[in-house]
Amino acid sequence: MELQTKSPTTQNDFSQHTPMMRQYLRIKAEYPDLLVFYRMGDFYELFYDDAKKAAKLLNITLTARGQSAGHAIPMAGVPYHAVENYLTKLVRLGESVVICEQIGDPATSKGPVAREVTRIITPGTVSDEALLDEHRDNTLMVIHQEKDRFGIATLDITSGRFLIQEIISENALFAEIERIRPAELLISEENSVHPLKADSIKRRPPWEFDHATALTLLCQQFQTKSLDGFGITHLPLAITAAGCLLQYVNYTQKSALPHIHSIQAEQNEEALFIDANTRRNLELITNLQGEEVHSLAWLLDHTATPMGSRLLRRWINRPLRDQILLQQRQNAVSTLLEKRNYSEIYENLRHIGDLERIVARIALRSARPRDLMQLRQALGVLPTLHQQLTNLPLNKQLQEIKNNLGLFDELFRLLKKAIIENPPIVIRDGGVIADGYDAPLDELRNMSTNSHQFLIDLEQQERERTKINTVKVGYNRIHGYYIEISRAQAKQAPTEYIRRQTLKNVERYITPELKIFEDKVLSSRSRALAREKELYEQLLDTLIEKLIPLQQCASAIANLDVLNTLAERADTLNFNAPQFCDYPIIKIEAGRHPIVENVMTDPFMPNDTHLDEKRRMLIITGPNMGGKSTYMRQTALITLLAYIGSFVPAKNAQLGPIDRIFTRIGAADDLASGRSTFMVEMTETAAILHNATEESLVLMDEVGRGTSTFDGLSLAYACASYLATKLKAFALFATHYFELTALASTLQAVKNVHLDAVEHEEKIIFLHALREGPANKSYGLQVAQLAGIPRSVIQHARQKLEELENPVISETQQPQQNELFLPIENPVLTQLDKLNPDNLTPKQALDILYQLIQLRQQK
């Protein structure tokens, strides 16, 4: 039978269905674009297009249930106990899911069991531990656009971190999207910008982007009369975006959001600007293949807690310009390093767990018993951490951490008394609240647990009373308690025995006494479970009262974890403290690329970098594979590490104010946008030339290589000149165009350096050492030989190279390409320069004229 494809949408369509399906269709009509997981007994079922989509995405069986208009209704389902695994996969695919639970009792319901939507799971609003990456912020972002200005609001619901900002260019907008990498991005249906760097993009109706509504919603959320106290009233577009975000979160969570109690404006000038291209080229969070291995985060992340890991990535992604704050971080790292106690602090932090997200789940009332167990363990560690910090000479950063850690002795004792040592995963079946915590619960539990002895006594009593030696008293979940007698002795059953079940070899009965006992025991179990759930909710109420100090504690622990990790990394990787200056300088002694050094088996060759007011650009020449790109990247990474408060891989480093880091390294076709390699290269170069300043660090590698030699050389020359003379940015400019080295003779701030190499027996040996002056050879053929180019091809290339380097002009051969920017020799003019017309006869003059015409024709 053919499967129905679309869900019915009208009441007339509904009338053809069973009451249960009508209930489903009414709920589905409210969420037409989301997958509805509809609870039916031990399964969550999906129907119609939802079933087809889920079957494909989850690789589950597509079947059918009933009919609609003569067609079978498509159906797919997953077991309720395994639903988290399926939800995880859907969320990672960018899907949103509606969870519809049974809230009624099937045994007492007349008609369909009552059901309601209990939560909506979207990629940017999930809080369940199983659905989250513990190393990555799970951010919901909203963008509101008016003309060329953008308001941005972001919320990580798993921490309550609520931030807004305004941006005035698409380039800066895309840089922010690349930095934040939102799990879900909301934009207006009228928005002209279509950013692609988000796992899930949704368009919202324009009426959700209303400024007046946003003000009302935000004031209600923060329980204030105005937003003046938050210092954000000068950001109307961002406030509008925040209002849309809050509407969406309220829609999905269907619960209060007490952990979202503040909003903060991010100022662009507070941080180094790093565009999307530079983030990828420097491999800050992921490598060029999109994996974390061999990225800067991979190297640095030896944190003990998930929240510390996430904070470290935020620091890497947003280096600060405030040198005072950076010096405070650096001082804290120095203290932890000098006292050599980072290992002990690490061991204590390891027992904390993901306190930040546990607190958020408590606020959302979705915390599970093991969340409370982990919270109890974390609170138990705090006194030891306090003592460890007390033993240190505290600078401002460490003192703030100690103050915000807090001591929660009362909460710790409460959780110690209330929750058993190893609780089950969920509260649903009870067994979470410890004995002795609540007298009414203990009484109900005793009634249930002591039933076993009552049954033993009843069985012995009935055997003696009836003289039937096969009498047994038992229980099963379907029929409850019963008295069992063998079929052979069933005729001896007393008259007060009421037959309950007949099996092959036995008869089962119930008595009035046993029925009374059954009602009492079963009701005690259900009442005990209800009481336990009530006590659990009371615990959550108590914890929510301490929400703000618990959030402050989680933040303090994350900061301590990152600083402690930076101390360990500095010690292990031989990093040293950089020095900040208030004048223009980047002076690095024996700098190293931290990641390349870490993965190399051979010793890494350190190199110096010196840029200052009179030395703003280095033209870097040298062979391919000589280390030019590594050298440039290490300079940028050392700068960036200093600007997150870390020590750096160098013997010494002096760094002045830096506002931006740009890179133009490598390029590939952007076929999706119809852009060639050269177009991509020029677009990136244009962004740098439009946005770099005197305080920017610019890395330019092989500009102009994607076009003809003359075009490429001309562009590279002009770009380098513009950077050096107009922008006056700090620049490392790597090139194979040897003609660019001439800039150093005309521009005082430009210097030539090269990565050294030597040739031995037609083989190249890379020294990777930076030397002053230009390279004298490119060693292209030797590198090609290393790459495995056939020997015959190398020999042919060598012959051609000799011809090009030593051109011979003949009557039949065109002259070789002239050097750019040098005067071109003209044979006609050369001959004219040799003539003295006063010494020529008319015949000689005529002959020479014919020779000149011939030379001109050859030219």
UniProtKB/Swiss-Prot annotation:
InterPro entries: DNA_mismatch_repair_MutS (IPR005748), DNA_mismatch_repair_MutS-lik_N (IPR007695), DNA_mismatch_repair_MutS/MSH (IPR017261), DNA_mismatch_repair_MutS_C (IPR000432), DNA_mismatch_repair_MutS_clamp (IPR007861), DNA_mismatch_repair_MutS_core (IPR007696), DNA_mismatch_repair_MutS_N (IPR016151), DNA_mismatch_repair_MutS_sf (IPR036187)
Protease among keywords: no
SUPFAM superfamilies xref list: DNA repair protein MutS, domain I (SSF55271), DNA repair protein MutS, domain II (SSF53150), DNA repair protein MutS, domain III (SSF48334), P-loop containing nucleoside triphosphate hydrolases (SSF52540)
SMART domains assigned: MUTSac (SM00534), MUTSd (SM00533)
Amino acids binding ATP: 622-629
MF terms in GO: ATP binding; ATP-dependent DNA damage sensor activity; damaged DNA binding; mismatched DNA binding
CC terms in the record's Gene Ontology section: cytosol
Biological process, per Gene Ontology: mismatch repair
CDD domains tied to this protein: ABC_MutS1
Keyword DNA damage on entry: yes
Signal peptide segment: none
Keyword list, A-Z: ATP-binding, DNA damage, DNA repair, DNA-binding, Nucleotide-binding
Superkingdom of the source species: Bacteria
Pfam families tied to this protein: MutS_I, MutS_II, MutS_III, MutS_IV, MutS_V
Family of this protein: Belongs to the DNA mismatch repair MutS family.
Biological function: This protein is involved in the repair of mismatches in DNA. It is possible that it carries out the mismatch recognition step. This protein has a weak ATPase activity.
Record-given protein name: DNA mismatch repair protein MutS
The species this protein was found in: Coxiella burnetii (strain RSA 493 / Nine Mile phase I)
